[in-house]
Amino acid sequence: MPIIKSSRVNIGRFTIGGSIPIVIISIFDHDAKSLTEKFETKKLSDKNLYEIRFDLFDKVNIDEELEIIRALDEMDIDYIFTYRGHDPEKIYETAITKMVPAVDMDLSLLNKVNRRSPDTRIMVSYHTDSSKDMIEKLDEMLKANADIVKVACNYKDEKNFFKDLIEIAQRKEISGKPVLFIPMGKSFLRVISAYYVSDMVYAKYDKETAMGQPDPDYYNKAFSLFNYIG
């Protein structure tokens, strides 16, 4: 699990493409200081892989970004840095210059952010409400200069989800590149995607950063069931 395997890619100590999808805990906070305190007081464990949603912080500027990166580096935290806000090129180039473990950038930014580092994995992503657009973009993304590909779609009709799942599985099997397929809105669809194609899944800490994010325990129980059935 996932059934369709990919080549292996590391984000820090975590290996994508293994036997069980990696659970990413998506987090944000007021500022660097409040985030650091959560790790220091063990509210957040240093054993997990995190998504840092910098655009959702109350304080968003280069100095705050640098302080977050410095603090997480000192505490040896593995994470994916994500920013969906104003002036993204500058924010991402700063993150890559500082060699964060991974960044998640929108497809529209891939050729605008010129900075690259062998220490930073690049995840290219595309979010939409149109499954047709998503599949078309996926073909482009699988050929792009990125380590990991993520597509996310909001579904009103579950039949469209299953149709897309087959399409994505076929493409992943051919390319061998790590793929995340995120069906937004319903948590159980995220689990089904993980069983077949998704090498990583997103969980909430205390608040969702996208529709339908369950907590980590939801995934862990589902994955245990799949292993039992297998």
From Swiss-Prot:
Reactions this protein catalyses: 3-dehydroquinate = 3-dehydroshikimate + H2O
Keywords on record: Amino-acid biosynthesis, Aromatic amino acid biosynthesis, Lyase, Schiff base
Natural source organism: Thermoplasma volcanium (strain ATCC 51530 / DSM 4299 / JCM 9571 / NBRC 15438 / GSS1)
Assembly information from the UniProt record: Homodimer.
Family: Belongs to the type-I 3-dehydroquinase family.
Function: Involved in the third step of the chorismate pathway, which leads to the biosynthesis of aromatic amino acids. Catalyzes the cis-dehydration of 3-dehydroquinate (DHQ) and introduces the first double bond of the aromatic ring to yield 3-dehydroshikimate.
Name of the gene: aroD
Descriptive protein name: 3-dehydroquinate dehydratase
Binding site for 3-dehydroquinate: 26, 51-53, 84, 190, 209, 213
PANTHER family, per the entry: 3-DEHYDROQUINATE DEHYDRATASE
Enzyme Commission number(s): 4.2.1.10
Enzyme class, UniProt record, top EC level: lyase
Domain of life: Archaea
